[in-house]
Amino acid sequence: METKIEKVLKILEEEIVAAEGCTEPIALSYAAAKARRILGTVPNKVDVFLSGNIIKNVKSVTIPNSEGMIGIEPAIAMGLIAGDDKKELMVISDTTHEQVQEVRDFLDKKLIKTHVYPGDIKLYIRLEISNGENNVLLEIKHTHTNITRILKNDKVLLSQICNDGDFNSSLTDRKVLSVKYIYDLAKTIDIDLIKPIFQKVIRYNSAIADEGLKGKYGVNIGKMILDNIEKGIYGNDVRNKAASYASAGSDARMSGCALPVMTTSGSGNQGMTASLPVIKFAAEKNLSEEELIRGLFVSHLITIHVKTNVGRLSAYCGAICAASGVAAALTFLHGGSFEMVCDAITNILGNLSGVICDGAKASCAMKISSGIYSAFDATMLALNKDVLKSGDGIVGVDIEETIRNVGELAQCGMKGTDETILGIMTK
């Protein structure tokens, strides 16, 4: 029987994984590459059935290594032509210029037909491909690489039982997670158990943030903040530097930068939000590597805990979930008590809950900067023993009730918002 610590380590392994490019289009590339390998050839007929949240998150984001292509059809074509499904979310990392031209030629044939999946599953992908002689059906539910069904010529190759109504059903049981357990474990866990994964987080995510500050990506929110620090318009402080650093990573990723990132809860933007402000804070305050890693442990697990309630994809901005993890980590690294960590999370969730997700795109970087600024405010309030009170809007009687309330808001209250956003984006 697994111990609680073993379950937590397994959760980290599931949720913190490398991915190149925004995870929703990359999930399409992965599904396409897998289906093509089973078919044996590039198909001449492709039908894809997608949930609204997948459509929303693929529509406006640049696909890495595609030489600037954007959207559903290019994401699928990249997987069909250039993908290696064995690399999972790094599926198109080795694409060549010649393969990109093949992708463009394939797209010119207009062989891909996109359909809206009518069910309630938020993350749903089904590919049906054919080469005239053989056909393959491949289905993904709930998480980006969770293949639940594969058919070839109507013969079942894979059928995985999956609870359609529970978006966490394919994952390790999250009941082990609570803010109290995360806080206590962060203080006592053997650092060698978590050092390898978080060293990789530091290395990968710092690299793309550095690139975002050097190049021209998206609306350059990260570079803009840094430039204004240097001009003396913004203060030369850790809050501004942290917002700049994390935003720069998103600027680059949303604009197709081919550098990989370590994701959190299925999202690169969440992975960067949960890590880069903490990395920058630790550097500015000369904290030890162990202190940084324990801080990252807090930020990632709080993010995962909140996202477990909110859901993989919804109308609720995932960067705000990750910003709550940042607030917890900053408070923890300041030496804050458990109560102060709870207060910091309460402050940010009481402030920014309701920020919408209207798809993956350049403006995600701006939402990340907003979340990080709020995380610093939430932290300083908590350290000063100031906190939003129970009954103030969605704030519950304790932190766990507040997190559950946020989940209810995202899953139930914002369902209509999600549908309206998709309608606006596709009209």
Curated annotation (Swiss-Prot):
Coiled coil: none annotated. It holds the Pfam family SDH_alpha. GO terms for molecular function: L-cysteine desulfhydrase activity. Belongs to the UPF0597 family. This is UPF0597 protein FN1147. InterPro entries: Ser_deHydtase-like_asu, UPF0597. GO terms for biological process: L-cysteine catabolic process to pyruvate.
